Amino acid sequence: KFVAGNDFNYVTTHAQAIQSAKSYNISSCSSMAVESGDVRMSDFNVADIILGLEKNDPNSLGYYKTFSHSMQQHLRNYVSGGGRIFVSGAYVGSDMANEEERNFLADVLRISPDGRLRNNGGMVMGLGMNFGFHDKLNDKHYAATTSDIISPLGNAYCAMKYSNETSAAIAYKGERYRAFTMGF
């Protein structure tokens, strides 16, 4: 039996959640459209960066770096102009290994990778709620079988925790921009 569970409906899922607030218009594009300049991030108030399980894997047939050098530059420019970013991904910190990449995480997302979490039970708490996410392979939804533990830097703070009390999401509200990053 083949169990994949990824029907690539993440844009629809995120759009439906955003739409439920009844306050926002939604557009979507690929990271390649941003990196090539076909889409200008400055045209949007908020960018929802959905990374899922993207990571640089030498065994992969394609290049799936969480934040390519080009994307890092686009995001730096976007936040310097007051943009707001919402980032989610199971390798958001751990895939950024060299000094330049870690500086991007610190300067833009205001996070520091702090390890990986396995077999958490898929529970997160914070912002006045508790909820689960898929952390076991199944045929319905992609699963983040391991997640990033991320720590806040500077004026950022831990907004959500995994069930073992490690940090699952970091929020930052600066003078120029805002960022919210989830490690799952």
Task: Locate the predicted segments by residue.
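Active-site-proximal beta-strand elements of phosphoester/diester hydrolases
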Residues: 158-159, 176-184
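Short, surface-exposed beta-strand/loop micro-motifs that present aromatic residues
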Residues: 147-148, 163-178
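Short, solvent-exposed polar/charged micro-motifs at secondary-structure junctions
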Residues: 36-43, 126-129, 167-170
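A glycine-rich, often tryptophan-bearing local segment used as a flexible ligand/cofactor-contacting loop or short
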Residues: 56-164
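Helical hinge/lid and interdomain linker segments adjacent to catalytic or ligand-binding clefts
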Residues: 2-103
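Short, conserved catalytic or adaptor-binding loops enriched in Gly and charged residues
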Residues: 16-21, 148-153, 172-173
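Sequence-pattern detector for short linear motifs
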Residues: 4, 143-144, 181
